[in-house]
């Protein structure tokens, strides 16, 4: 079997590659987004704009895997080929951008979903899911790291099943909700005059604290952004 993998996450890429010696009978080709400055071409790992490809490229592969890819899979691809997504959220809750950010804010469940892709965003019948906790002291980064570890755990357990088609597809439990990049961007500016409880402020800051990124900010009297984060520690 020829497998095409799109990923823009170094941790997932390295963890997935560690699984491959168990499947020597298959061929795995890796691609990343050309605008991903964190990656550079290497053996069997190339930059590629998926939307610029067509049937000549698609037909080379029996399976497409999206592992934290920053590219949307074209309708032509998902409608005519087997495409599976490893999504860092618990579908149908908080589909779209940064599920853990919005789960901290709206209290909806978070976790990992492996699903067959269709034309809609983070949508389609589910192969496997795992729900994960969010603790009061967690920032976005804490939850995200927990999600990544669970994704590799599920791939370690089920990659062989994916390759052999040994799974059952379960419909999503409703359509849930979707968050877009614009929804995240709207969270980042902090209005210092906005009324809020301490709990709301803490949740907003921990949802936006994700090292090394600078997300939350307010604007000072000189018109300069002042970035804000939060550190939380539970007593021993």
Task: Give the predicted meaning of each segment.
Residues 1-236:
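One-carbon transfer enzymes
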């Amino acid at each position: 079997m020829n497998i095409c993998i799109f990923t823009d996450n170094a941790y997932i890429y390295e963890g997935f590659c560690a699984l491959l010696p168990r499947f020597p009978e298959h061929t795995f080709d890796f691609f990343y987004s050309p605008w991903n400055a964190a990656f550079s071409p290497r053996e069997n790992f190339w930059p590629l704009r998926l939307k610029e490809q067509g049937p000549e490229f698609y037909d080379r592969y029996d399976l497409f895997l999206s592992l934290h890819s920053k590219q949307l899979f074209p309708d032509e691809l998902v409608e005519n080929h087997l495409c599976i997504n490893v999504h860092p959220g618990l579908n149908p809750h908080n589909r779209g951008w940064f599920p853990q950010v919005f789960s901290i804010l709206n209290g909806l469940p978070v976790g990992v979903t492996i699903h067959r892709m269709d034309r809609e965003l983070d949508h389609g019948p589910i192969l496997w899911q795992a729900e994960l906790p969010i603790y009061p002291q967690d920032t976005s980064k804490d939850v995200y790291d927990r999600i990544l570890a669970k994704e590799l755990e599920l791939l370690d357990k089920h990659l062989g099943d994916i390759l052999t088609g040994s799974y059952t597809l379960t419909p999503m439990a409703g359509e849930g909700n979707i968050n877009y990049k614009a929804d995240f961007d709207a969270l980042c500016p902090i209005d210092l005059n906005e009324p809020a409880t301490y709990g709301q402020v803490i949740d907003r800051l921990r949802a936006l604290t994700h090292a090394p990124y600078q997300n939350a900010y307010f604007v000072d009297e000189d018109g300069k952004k002042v970035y804000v984060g939060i550190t939380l520690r539970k007593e021993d």
